[in-house]
Amino acid sequence: MIWVRQSDDTGGVWFECLPTTAPPDTLLGMVQRGRGAGWLAAVADPVEGRAALLACLTDDPRWDHQVESRAEFYASLAVALEVSAADIAACGDINDEDHWLVAETLTALSVRGDSNARELLAQRIPDTWFEDLMAEPTLPFPPLNAPLSALLGNEHLVSHHDLMHRLRTTTDPDDLAALHEATRDPNRRGFRSAMLALAERGDTSFVTQVGDILAGNPVGQPRAGFLGYLPRLPARDSLPIARLWFGLPDSRDDAALQVLALHATAQDVSAIRARLAVSESTYDQCDLVEALGRVPECGPYPELRTVFTDACYSYLRRESAQALATTDPDFANTFATECLWDCEAGTREVGAKYAPATEQVQRRLAELAADEDEAVRDAARRRLVGPPAR
């Protein structure tokens, strides 16, 4: 086991014990990472594949348990390898958070129609798990045409899609006054939404304040509002500032990375590649990889292939697949096919768009036409009647 320093947009920091991941070129290492190549290798070697699957379910290999997808990946592999629901349930107590992947995989099997998985879940999950979910919501929600000052004070509405649209587009003087009032106190409800909305409106009046605050490495909820401000500004305003902040030893660098992920140009490539070569932060790597994907004219970038094969974080592999698809002419013949079996929907979607039209790919596209993810389904169905993307 290894201890890894984790953090989030609010500035929270903690240390988490993560499983040791096998080398990326081994069957176990690929199955742990959720790679399509791992799924295919496991099916080709059922004995080793079964052992790898059960090892992953016993010792959850995910770098981020909250967001990384594995349950459907492991459930489909269990079906292909004829691993029973009982074998999966034996990998850990599903009421122990260290083994929630077992419960998630059993759930994925039950959705596929496995009655044994459904019965095992019913036996082991306490009824109290569902009591809060079944309760009728009773929170008071003001109508979205209410005064903006009232809406920004409601913690359950501050990120509502329609409210954010109103914040971005309103010309009402009272609304604008309420919007600016909400930025006065970083600890008040609505602060983050107000800051993001003003940035999207092109209001650059907070740049100096945001830079000063981020230089002090703020923590807690206010950090998210300050950190999200610069990336929401138009590129003409944010990119010059991001280039100045890039590499600074404080939270300004985090904001700069987010801007480069959205708006990098050829001018930024050398600095991005140099940073990617030495970066040990998975979240930073995600932004750096996405930034390279914005500049296909300077590619291909060999380091993106290494990120694709080695990344333990499946979101990072998804970002590298998307970047490779636009920057590497050989992507269709190297990684695109395995992407069709990847654990992450975004990576499967990339594969559906770019994989060559082989018999194996056509069969897999027919399966993905019924994928759980709508974007994957749409991409697969388009490919079944059309050529790969270029």
Regions found by a protein language model. Name each.
Residues M1-T20, L28-A51, A55, R62-V83, ...:
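Structural detector for internal amphipathic alpha-helices that build alpha-solenoid repeat scaffolds
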Residues P24, R50, P173-L176, V207, ...:
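Core helices of alpha-solenoid repeat scaffolds
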Residues A122-P126, A366-E372:
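TPR/TPR-like (Sel1-like) alpha-helical repeat modules
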Residues A332, C343-G346, A375:
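HEAT/HEAT-like alpha-solenoid repeats
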Residues Q362, A375-V376:
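A generic membrane alpha-helix/interface feature
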